[in-house]
Regions:
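Conserved ABC ATPase signature
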Residues: 157-161, 165
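Conserved ABC ATPase "signature" region
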Residues: 110, 114-117, 121-153, 203-208, ...
Length: 324
């Protein structure tokens, strides 16, 4: 099993090492480290204001960390590329929909590919080839809209869509670029309960595609980090939960004041098969454990005590989809 764990570490897609971030005298993140493996769907939870969105912006590259490093690994084993700014290897879906109101759903999804693979001079000087390329991009956009159950809405404009439909289009926008990792920043926070459940089922379908790919010895197509304050969502849609919190025992490490939030929880999620039988008592216990450790601890917590994801992989009973 140890050799399998080492092999998994060779498949790390996102590597965060010792990230610190501050704004003036306000310390936000301290020594944040997290490795995410290809094919994982990881939920990142934490109390409001703990720095989840700051960490996400650092991963995206719009707000680089003050110290530490973030790397995205696109190939096999290796150091990976240091994140210095936004790039195609990272896709992001925000809570607020990033759609052009004057484009249809299909055109919105195809737009990123069109911009990435052509230019205005190319369009003007190579118009016949550009038309052929555009037709191909539109076909791909149609495929990805079908994948998120919007095959019937390709010609709708954002103003004619519900909030859930617009968010599905935003997810398809990210998927079509085939990034190494997709980042979801509270993607369902503004939606009603029924719509949230529908979109969670969509994420579970992506999770199932990862499982199917592993069984067929193919590369899992989706690696996702979803930032959310909803514990049920974090546990339900993924195979791993990480917790970021400022309520840890920083005094024992020699600090007079909190140096920022850090990872205090990192464990596998109990649900393995999207359509399989759920052990609700295990699910409920993990929810209580996360709340005690991340959201409402009885006192300062040892930040390393509940970071046991990699150690738990050594136990065959704790193997999750990441090892399939």
């Amino acid at each position: 099993m140890a050799s399998e764990v080492l092999d998994i570490k060779d498949r790390v897609v996102l590597s965060i090492k010792g990230v610190n971030h501050w704004f003036g005298r306000h310390r936000v993140l301290f020594d944040v480290s997290l490795d995410i493996v290809r094919g994982e769907i990881v939920g990142l939870v934490g109390p409001s204001g703990c720095g989840k969105s700051t960490l996400l912006r650092a991963i995206v590259g719009t707000h680089p960390p003050c110290s530490g490093e973030i790397r995205v690994c696109s190939g096999g084993p290796g150091a990976g590329a240091l994140v210095r700014g936004p790039g195609r290897d990272r896709g992001i879906v925000y809570q607020q929909y990033s759609l052009f109101p004057f484009l249809t759903a299909q055109e919105n999804v195809a737009f990123g590919l069109m911009v990435d693979e052509s230019s205005i001079p190319y369009r003007l000087l190579m118009y016949p080839k550009w038309r052929k390329m555009r037709a191909h991009h539109m076909e791909l956009a149609a495929e990805f809209l079908k994948r998120v159950d919007l095959g019937h809405a390709m010609r709708l404009y954002p103003g004619n869509m519900s909030g859930g439909m617009r968010q599905r289009v935003a997810v398809a926008q990210a998927l079509i670029m085939k990034p190494e990792i997709i980042l979801l920043d509270e993607p369902f926070g503004a939606l009603d309960e029924a719509t949230r459940e529908d979109l969670q089922c969509m994420l579970l379908s992506l999770y199932q595609e990862n499982l199917d790919a592993r069984r067929e010895k193919r590369k899992p197509p989706y690696t996702i980090l979803i930032v959310t304050h909803e514990l049920n969502e974090a546990i339900y849609v993924g195979d791993r939960v990480a917790g970021l919190s400022q309520w840890w025992d920083w005094k024992s490490e020699g600090f007079d004041e909190c140096p920022g939030a850090t990872i205090v929880y990192d464990r596998p999620a109990p649900v393995e098969e999207p359509g399989g039988e759920r052990k609700y008592e295990v699910y409920a216990e993990q929810r209580r454990e996360i709340r005690r450790t991340v959201f409402d601890p009885p006192g300062p917590v040892d930040r390393r005590r509940a970071q046991t994801f990699w150690e738990e992989l050594d136990n065959p009973e704790n193997r999750r989809g990441v090892l399939r």
